Amino acid sequence: MKKILCLGLVLGCVAGFVMGCAGKDLPGDLEKDTIIEECHNIIEMVNDRDFQGVVNLFRDDLKEQLTADALGQALNQPLDQLGDFVKYKTESVAAAKEDNTDKDMAAAVIGVEYSEGSISYVISFDTDMKVIGLYLK
């Protein structure tokens, strides 16, 4: 039986988000391929346990609230349980709004297969391509 991991990093004003319709245009100049490429970059950093590199990609106000140590403490155990990266399984990107501010954003859900299980990364970006949310489920 597959274990279901649910890990939420609640970051300041990003308490959550509401996914928009998948057919809705992405905000600003954001492009689906660019978002997916950046998600792959982030997931590779997570897999390499380069948590400072991940934190550096967050929006400035969120960097003040998140440390590489805290991110590592949250992610090391799930990563240990999942084993080695195998492949990306699914990728989707949708327009969304930040709950607390109603600002435009984009959210990507990337399904990833590991040697001991699978997990979905939910990564959200503001219109400047700064990370504003990182969730594993």
Which residues does each PLM region occupy?
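Short solvent-exposed beta->alpha transition segments
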Residues: 52-105
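Internal amphipathic alpha-helical segments of the cytochrome P450 catalytic fold
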Residues: 18, 51-52, 131
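Short hydrophobic/aromatic segments of transmembrane alpha-helices and their interfaces
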Residues: 36, 54, 113-115
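Sec-dependent bacterial lipoprotein signal peptides
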Residues: 1-19
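Short, low-complexity N-terminal intrinsically disordered segments enriched in polar/charged residues
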Residues: 21-48
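Exposed beta-sheet edge and beta->alpha loop/turn motif
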Residues: 92-137
